[in-house]
């Protein structure tokens, strides 16, 4: 932790094609080894595939998918009297989008399609239709929070 106050948040520049900060954040999540050009190519070709397969605007479908993935509750471990409790807590808005994007990219990478463009496009379409690995992860997170509702009074 810094000694002299908190570190200011760096602002993300919107991407050149869709003019969306959310798209830039997704590009940053896809990017490996600083290869932004490759990440942009993957995302924009995935968006083209989404438009072809759904017949709707890719940005619309993507935003719908992210809204279906973002968690509202999660559990945090809290040590009380020698035992650990999984305490349900609300997720801050910024963390919601971060988790949503992280889960989308991770579950896209785990899919079986041949190219990353295909995997990402299919994961976005699945998430928009409330199916797929990322949405299942959100459901599991919510189930954990629901199951541990009894420990909600340990919140800090």
UniProtKB/Swiss-Prot annotation:
Keyword Transcription regulation: no
An example molecular function term from Gene Ontology annotations: tRNA binding
Database matches in CDD domains: uS7_Bacteria
A GO term from the CC aspect: small ribosomal subunit
SUPFAM superfamilies in the record: Ribosomal protein S7
Domain of life: Bacteria
Keyword match Acetylation: no
Pfam families: Ribosomal_S7
GO biological process, one term: translation
Swiss-Prot/TrEMBL keywords: Ribonucleoprotein, Ribosomal protein, RNA-binding, rRNA-binding, tRNA-binding
InterPro entries in UniProt: Ribosomal_uS7, Ribosomal_uS7_bac/org-type, Ribosomal_uS7_CS, Ribosomal_uS7_dom, Ribosomal_uS7_dom_sf
HAMAP family linked: Ribosomal_uS7_B
Homology family: Belongs to the universal ribosomal protein uS7 family.
NCBIfam families associated with the record: rpsG_bact (TIGR01029)
Protein function: One of the primary rRNA binding proteins, it binds directly to 16S rRNA where it nucleates assembly of the head domain of the 30S subunit. Is located at the subunit interface close to the decoding center, probably blocks exit of the E-site tRNA.
Self-association state and partner proteins as the record states: Part of the 30S ribosomal subunit. Contacts proteins S9 and S11.
UniProt name for this protein: Small ribosomal subunit protein uS7
């Amino acid at each position: 932790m810094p000694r002299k106050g908190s570190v200011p948040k760096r602002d993300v520049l919107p991407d050149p094609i869709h003019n969306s900060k959310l798209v830039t954040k997704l590009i940053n999540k896809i990017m490996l080894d600083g290869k932004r050009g490759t990440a942009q190519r993957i995302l924009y070709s995935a968006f083209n595939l989404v438009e072809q397969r759904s017949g709707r605007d890719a940005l619309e479908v993507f935003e719908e998918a992210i809204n279906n993935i973002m968690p509202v509750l999660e559990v945090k471990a809290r040590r009380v009297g020698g035992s650990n409790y999984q305490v349900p807590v609300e997720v801050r808005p910024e963390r919601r989008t971060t988790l949503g994007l992280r889960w989308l990219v991770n579950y896209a990478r785990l899919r079986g399609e041949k190219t990353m463009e295909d995997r990402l496009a299919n994961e976005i379409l699945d998430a928009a239709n409330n199916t797929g690995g990322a949405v299942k992860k959100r459901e599991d997170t919510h189930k954990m929070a629901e199951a541990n509702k009894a420990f909600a009074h340990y919140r800090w």
